Amino acid sequence: MDFSGKNVWVTGAGKGIGYATALAFVEAGAKVTGFDQAFAQEQYPFATEVMDVADAAQVAQVCQRLLAETERLDVLVNAAGILRMGATDQLSKEDWQQTFAVNVGGAFNLFQQTMNQFRRQRGGAIVTVASDAAHTPRIGMSAYGASKAALKSLALSVGLELAGSGVRCNVVSPGSTDTDMQR
């Protein structure tokens, strides 16, 4: 596919699925902005923005600045995510809350800042990376699975809310993927 001239945002772009997705869009000709808490490499083949998707105020500030600099946002990919392992009764409250803050809250924060832009331009696409853990339980992954199930529902609801504006919203649910998060 040719994405020449398309403006694409990818969260979680510092590594893993987010990085691979951002790279694929660059190779397809898109102008990509990647968001993450940190970027390990010095140079990336796309613009980078250090941003904690779980921090609503920071997301608002960064998104408002970037949206003021562009006419369109063609694609948003919500790929930021974390995995905190542990049996449910041994998982810390902080791990539970942080998993939801990033995996669900991060997408929520991006939706809040971008939905009006997608409505105004009457088009675009949003892809949200959930997980097959949303519907296939795994030992030690209760927080992750529950957060991805919530994320899937959130993304599908946003899809219904934006359908009348010609915005496509899809959810992908990959299985185990060989990334740093899984190692």
What is each stretch, according to the model?
Residues 14-15:
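Conserved glycine-rich cofactor-binding loop
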Residues 79-84:
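Conserved NAD(P)H cofactor-binding loop of Rossmann-fold oxidoreductase domains
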Residues 87-88, 95-97:
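Substrate-binding pocket helix/loop in short-chain dehydrogenase/reductase
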Residues 89, 136-142, 164-165:
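Active-site loop immediately N-terminal to the catalytic Tyr-X3-Lys motif
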Residues 111, 147:
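Active-site helix of classical SDR
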Residues 116, 160-161:
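Alpha-helical segment proximal to the catalytic Tyr-Lys
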Residues 131:
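Residue(s) in the substrate-gating loop at a strand-loop-helix junction
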